[in-house]
Design a protein with these regions (language model features):
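Glycine-rich segments within core transmembrane alpha-helices of 12-TM secondary carriers
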Residues: 161-185, 387-398
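Central cavity-lining transmembrane alpha-helices of secondary-active solute carriers
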Residues: 67-86, 105-107, 295-308
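Extracytoplasmic gate region of multi-pass secondary transporters
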Residues: 42-43, 246-301, 394-398
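Multi-pass alpha-helical transporter architecture, strongest
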Residues: 212-219, 421-440
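C-terminal ends and interior cores of transmembrane alpha-helices
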Residues: 102-120, 326-342
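C-terminal transmembrane helical hairpin of 12-TM major facilitator-type secondary transporters
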Residues: 318-365
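Extracellular/periplasmic helix-loop-helix junction of adjacent transmembrane segments
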Residues: 45-77
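Cytoplasmic membrane-interface "Motif A"-like loop-to-helix N-cap segments
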Residues: 90-102, 314-326
Length: 440
């Protein structure tokens, strides 16, 4: 028995090591594509798809049908987390990350190549829905694997910093998505954009996918999983084990992510919609001006992500996140309504910068916190499942609820809604144990 343990330790010590630069690129590239895709699809679903993928008729009905395809990805993501989590916990992190990125990449590029309703009729929206489902499926396995790639390759005292690498992909992807639409608005007429220009961002994502595949194929398996595989300790059905033996931490992990998702979708989708909608319903600001504001604010998001990782390594995940979540509640109740509601571009810019900086602070530690909640044999499935179920509870409904609350009760109730979601996260954090010194 002692000889076996010695052999396993020797195998782990002699296992090939991934360089930090390779881990950084391989882990953040998928998240960058995820957020790049989120924004280009959300924009196209409102501006383009109702006109080219759905029968001509009631414009409102066409828009709702288009937005329904956007929601398909949220349904597909938990399925993807179970599917890719199964193979990630049984076969390995590396091969599963390659498969999830390939699934996501093919589906995204396919959207940019789809024929329109005018060309192939009812098949066009059906193929769009299928491609969107494929995107969600790939996305469901992407983040958890990327977070594990980072944290399972990290030195023990720097796990939160390494875990912030995949989180950096979010501001990078969002920045490039906004930049792409700004560039297209300068170079193309509205007619050119509606005819073929909208396809460019989807097809361009192939470049990011190829870079990601090149780096990921050359990776070695993480030392933590290599040890489990050598000992043949993989479980047969990771999702079954997760939902029978680790229900409490799965639920807590889901609610820990809730404030992050709600904050991001309110700061981006809702804020863009409210800011550009003509007064008196919205602020009536020019679309390009709001895009510029978001691009500048996203820089604050990106800066805060690694800072949050460093803070979580220094003070612990739980204490850091409790403070940050409390700040989100204060922002939602006392800063959000007066700054956004002012209609003053400078104050709206301040609102976006503060809100997205808080987003960086709350999102940064998640790359370490969620994986550390689960044992190695179900870590891929557990981290992915919590992350993606939370996207349904937080991300998928946040813009709709915020818009409805603002229209019926006023902007301050949007802040109360955000504060309530953050309060649920705060409760989950208080019920969670500290994981900083936990061995993976």
């Amino acid at each position: 028995m002692q000889a076996t343990a010695t052999t396993l330790n020797s195998e782990q010590e002699n296992a090939p090591v991934n360089s930090r630069n390779k881990v950084v690129v391989a882990s953040l590239i998928g998240t960058a594509i995820e957020f790049f895709d989120f924004y280009i699809y959300a924009t196209a679903a409102v501006i383009v798809f109702p006109h080219i993928f759905f029968p001509q008729g009631d414009p409102t009905a066409a828009t709702l049908q288009s937005l329904a395809t956007f929601a398909i990805a949220f349904v597909a993501r938990p399925i993807g987390s179970a599917l890719f989590g199964h193979f990630g916990d049984r076969v390995g992190r590396k091969v599963t990350l390659v498969a999830s990125l390939l699934t996501m990449g093919i589906s995204t590029v396919a959207i940019g190549l789809l024929p329109t309703y005018e060309t192939i009729g009812i098949l066009a929206p059906l193929l769009l829905a299928l491609a969107r489902f494929g995107q969600g499926l790939g996305l469901g396995g992407e983040w958890g694997g990327a977070a594990l790639l980072a944290t399972e390759n990290a030195p023990p005292r720097k796990r939160a910093l390494y875990g912030s690498f995949p989180q950096l992909g979010a501001p990078i992807g969002f920045f490039f998505a906004n930049g792409t639409f700004l560039l297209l608005s300068w170079l193309l007429t509205d007619e050119q954009f509606m005819t073929w220009g909208w396809r460019i961002p989807f097809i361009f994502s192939a470049v990011l996918v190829l870079i990601g595949l090149y780096v990921r194929v050359s990776l070695h398996e993480t030392p933590v999983f290599a040890k489990v595989a050598a000992a043949k300790k993989q479980v047969k059905i990771p999702l079954g084990t997760l939902l029978t033996k680790h229900v409490r931490v799965t639920v807590l992990g889901t609610f820990i992510m809730l404030a992050t998702y709600t904050l991001f979708y309110i700061m981006t989708v809702y804020s863009m919609t409210f800011s550009t909608t003509p007064a008196p319903v919205g602020l009536g600001l020019p679309r390009n001006e709001v895009l510029w504001m978001l691009m500048m604010a996203v820089i604050g998001f990106g800066v805060m992500v690694p800072i949050a990782g460093l803070l979580a390594d220094r003070f612990g995940r739980r204490p850091s996140m409790i403070v940050i979540t409390s700040l989100i509640i204060l922002f939602a109740l006392f800063v959000f309504p007066p700054l956004l509601g002012s209609g003053n571009p400078a104050l709206v810019m301040a609102y976006l910068l503060i809100g997205l900086s808080l987003m960086g602070l709350t999102f940064g530690p998640m790359g370490a916190l969620l994986p550390e909640l689960f044992p190695t044999e179900v870590r891929y499935t557990g981290a992915s499942f919590s992350y993606n179920v939370s996207s349904i509870l937080g991300a998928s409904v946040a813009p709709y609820i915020a818009t409805w609350l603002q229209a019926n009760y006023g902007l301050q109730y949007v802040g109360i809604y955000l504060a309530a979601m953050a309060a649920l996260t705060l409760i989950a954090l208080l019920l969670t144990h500290e994981t900083r010194h936990q061995s993976l």
